[in-house]
Design a protein with these regions (language model features):
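C-terminal capping/gating helix-and-loop segments adjacent to ligand/active sites or protein-protein/ligand interfaces
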Residues: 49, 287, 330-331, 338-397
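Hinge/lid segment of periplasmic solute-binding proteins
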Residues: 76-129, 143, 152, 179, ...
Length: 598
C-alpha cells in the first residue's frame, strides 16, 4: 500500500511502467485498511496512492483551486455548502458512470446532486442512536421505548432506581445534530413546512430555521430536559466516561454508532433503539455515509484515466467491497439497491427498518455542528424561549465564511513524503524553519505530516491555512547534547512503532530545522549535526522545540526527557500565520543525509 500526504505539486496521473497511477484522497490515514487492500487487489493493473485530506472539504477545495486535485476524493463530514463550492471541479457521475448511479436507492443521491449533476456517491452508512442495556431493562421490568414518551418514562423509572437513564456527551457537535435532526425528523423535517425547509437546505437555500421550525426543535429539547432524558450534566460528560458508566450498569442507555464493534464488558445484552417520535411508526434510522466519493472533472477528460477511475469506483461500491467495510462494524446500511449488509445482534431489533429503508441521511452545512452545540447548550444550561433559541441557532448556522486574505506565499513546496528528497517533506521543512525563527531554538523537530497539503504561491485565507496546516501545540526544553540525541533517536524509532490497533506509526517522519541528521543504513548510529556539519557536543546545552506528536512519541516510548518539555503559547498554525502575513516564507532545506551502501 502506498501512503502519502495530501497532495503534490506535479506528476498527477503519472504511470509506473505500464501502470496508471490513481490518486485517492481519503479522510484520514488509518481507516479501512482491509478495504483499501481489497480495492488494490481488484485493480492489479493500477497503482493506487492513498492520500489524506483530514476530513476537510476545504483541503479538497484548496487543492482543486490550484489544479492539484486527486483523481478520487472522499469525505466523511459531508457539508452541503462546502460540497457545492467544490462542485465545479467535480465530474458528473450520473453521466460518466450511469450504471453505478442507477444502482442507488431512489432519493439517496438527492443531497449529493448539485445543479442537476450527481457529484458524489455515498459509501455504506452508519446508524447512530441509542444503545440500551437490555439486561437492565429485563431485570427491572422497564419497557423498551418505541416512542419519545416511552423514552421519557424509561429514564424516569431508572432514575428512581438510582440508575442514570441516558448518558450523552451533549457538548459534542455530532451529538447535538443527532438530537435536533433525529428526534425531529418524522415529526417535522419529513413533512409540511419542515420538508420544504430541508429541500431548500439541500438545494443551497437559507439554512436559517423558520419561527415554526425553531419552536419545534426547542420544544423537543425542552421536553427531554424536563423529563430528565437530558440533563445539564450531559454538557460536561465525555464519551469515555459515558461508556464506562454504561459498561458498569450504572447507566441504562447511551448514544452510540454502528461503525465499530461494541463488546459489553459486563456481558450484558445490548439493543439498538433508533430515533423516536410521537408514535412507534415515527421510528427512523439516522444515518450518514462512512465516506462519500467524488471524481475530479479534469481526470475524466483523460480517457485512460477516466476508464481507470471507473474501474476503481466499480470495485469500491461493489457488494463485496461494501461487506469488507462492514467487517469491523456492528452494522452498516447500503444505499445501493440489492446489497444486503450483515448486522449484529445489537441491531436485530431494527432489521425491519433496514429492510424497509426507513432512514434519512444526516444533513449538514459547515456551521451545523457549532449551531447545534450552541442550541443544545443553551437549552440544557438555561431556559430560552422559542424565539431566543431560534435566534441563537440561526445566528450560528448562517455565520458567513471568512474569506479575508491573511497572507501570501512566495514559494511552492510539496508535502508528499519523498517527493523531493528521501524521507523528507519539503513543506514540513518550511514549517520547521518558521518555528525555529520564531522561537530562537537551536533545533526544531516536528511531525512532518503537520504539512497537510502543498504550499502554493499566492494569497491565503483562514480556510486555506486550515487546509495546509495540521495544527499542533509546541513544547520546548533545554537539553544536553546526549539528551537531545536520545530524543531524536526515539523520534526516528517512532516511525516504526505502532500503538495498539493502529495501522500507522506514531510518528510519520520528523522534520528538522537548525540541525541536520545523518541516518545510517542499519538504523544504528544516527547522528545530529550542527549547521557547520560537525556533530553536536554531548555535554553542551541546546534549546529544543518539538511538536505534540513528537512529545507523544517520547512519552509512549518512555523517554525520560519527555517530562522536560513545557508548553509554548504559540502553535504551528499561529506561527505559520504570523510569518505568512509578512509574505516571505523560507525555501525548503534538506535536513536528512542517508548513508549510501557501496
Amino acid at each position: 500500500m502506498l501512503l502519502s500526504g495530501c497532495g503534490k505539486l506535479s506528476g498527477r496521473g503519472k504511470t509506473t511502467g505500464n501502470e496508471l497511477t490513481v490518486r485517492i484522497s481519503m479522510y484520514n490515514d488509518i481507516t479501512y485498511s482491509a478495504w483499501r487492500t481489497y480495492v488494490e487487489k481488484q485493480c492489479p493493473n493500477l497503482t493506487i496512492i492513498w492520500e489524506n485530506n483530514r476530513n476537510n472539504t476545504q483541503s479538497l477545495i484548496y487543492q482543486a483551486r490550484h489544479g492539484d486535485m486527486a483523481d478520487i476524493v472522499t469525505i466523511r463530514r459531508f457539508e452541503t455548502d462546502s460540497a457545492a463550492e467544490l462542485a465545479p471541479y467535480l465530474a458528473d457521475l450520473g453521466r460518466d458512470n450511469p450504471e453505478l448511479a442507477a444502482s442507488f436507492t431512489a432519493g439517496s443521491l438527492d443531497g449529493f446532486t448539485f445543479g442537476g449533476k450527481i457529484c458524489w456517491f455515498p459509501a455504506p452508512g452508519m446508524m447512530e442512536g441509542i444503545y440500551a442495556n437490555a439486561t437492565l431493562f429485563d431485570q427491572y421490568g422497564v419497557e423498551m421505548p418505541q416512542t419519545l414518551e416511552e423514552l421519557k418514562n424509561a429514564c424516569g423509572r431508572f432514575e428512581a432506581l438510582g440508575i442514570d437513564g441516558l448518558s450523552i456527551e451533549a457538548s459534542a457537535g455530532f451529538r447535538g445534530v443527532l438530537l435536533l435532526e433525529g428526534f425531529n425528523y418524522a415529526g417535522y423535517f419529513a413533512k409540511g413546512a419542515g420538508k420544504a425547509w430541508l429541500t431548500g437546505f439541500l438545494s443551497g437555500g437559507s439554512p436559517a430555521l423558520t419561527e415554526e421550525g425553531g419552536a419545534r426543535l426547542a420544544d423537543t429539547l425542552r421536553e427531554m430536559k424536563q423529563a430528565g432524558v437530558l440533563e445539564q450534566e450531559d454538557l460536561s460528560i465525555n464519551a469515555a466516561d459515558s461508556l464506562t458508566s454504561f459498561d458498569s450498569g450504572k447507566t441504562a442507555m447511551i448514544m452510540n454508532g454502528s461503525d465499530h464493534i461494541y463488546s459489553p464488558k459486563s456481558g450484558a445484552s445490548c439493543r439498538f433503539i433508533p430515533c423516536l417520535g410521537e408514535t412507534a411508526a415515527d421510528q427512523i434510522l439516522y444515518t450518514y455515509p462512512i465516506f462519500s466519493a467524488a471524481v475530479s472533472k479534469e481526470t475524466m477528460n483523460d480517457s485512460k484515466k477516466a476508464e481507470a477511475v471507473r474501474q476503481v469506483l466499480t470495485v469500491m461500491y461493489s457488494g463485496a467491497a461494501q461487506k469488507v467495510l462492514a467487517e469491523d462494524a456492528e452494522a452498516l446500511i447500503s444505499y445501493n439497491d440489492g446489497v444486503d449488509m450483515p448486522i449484529s445482534d445489537i441491531y436485530r431489533s431494527v432489521s425491519g427498518l433496514i429492510a424497509e429503508k426507513k432512514y434519512f441521511i444526516r444533513f449538514l452545512n459547515r456551521n451545523m455542528f457549532s449551531a447545534s452545540t450552541a442550541a443544545v447548550k443553551a437549552m440544557l444550561a438555561g431556559d430560552p424561549s422559542d424565539a431566543e433559541f431560534t435566534e441563537l441557532f440561526n445566528q450560528k448556522i448562517t455565520k458567513p465564511k471568512d474569506t479575508a486574505v491573511v497572507g501570501a506565499s512566495n514559494i511552492e513546496a510539496g508535502n508528499q513524503l519523498g517527493e523531493d528528497r528521501p524521507l523528507e517533506r519539503s513543506a514540513a521543512s518550511v514549517l520547521a524553519q518558521i518555528v525555529q525563527g520564531a522561537t530562537g531554538a537551536d533545533v526544531v523537530l516536528i511531525e512532518s505530516k503537520c504539512a497537510a497539503a502543498p504550499l502554493y504561491k499566492g494569497d491565503y485565507t483562514k480556510d486555506d491555512l486550515n487546509a495546509v496546516i495540521a495544527d499542533e501545540p509546541l513544547y520546548e526544553a533545554e537539553l544536553t547534547g546526549a539528551q537531545l540525541s536520545s530524543v531524536f533517536d526515539d523520534a526516528i524509532l517512532g516511525t516504526t512503532t505502532y500503538s495498539y490497533l493502529n495501522i500507522e506509526p506514531i510518528v510519520d517522519y520528523p522534520a528538522l530545522s537548525g540541525m541536520t541528521a545523518f541516518l545510517t543504513a542499519n538504523g544504528r548510529g544516527d547522528t545530529l549535526r550542527l549547521p557547520d556539519g560537525s556533530a553536536i557536543d554531548a555535554n553542551a546545552r541546546y534549546h529544543a522545540v518539538i511538536s505534540q506528536t513528537i512529545k507523544f512519541a517520547l512519552s509512549y516510548l518512555q523517554n525520560e526527557n519527555a517530562a522536560s518539555f513545557s508548553l509554548l503559547p504559540d502553535t504551528l498554525l499561529s506561527l505559520f500565520t504570523a510569518r505568512l502575513s509578512l509574505g516571505t516564507l523560507p525555501e525548503p532545506q534538506q535536513y536528512f543525509e542517508l548513508e549510501v551502501l557501496q
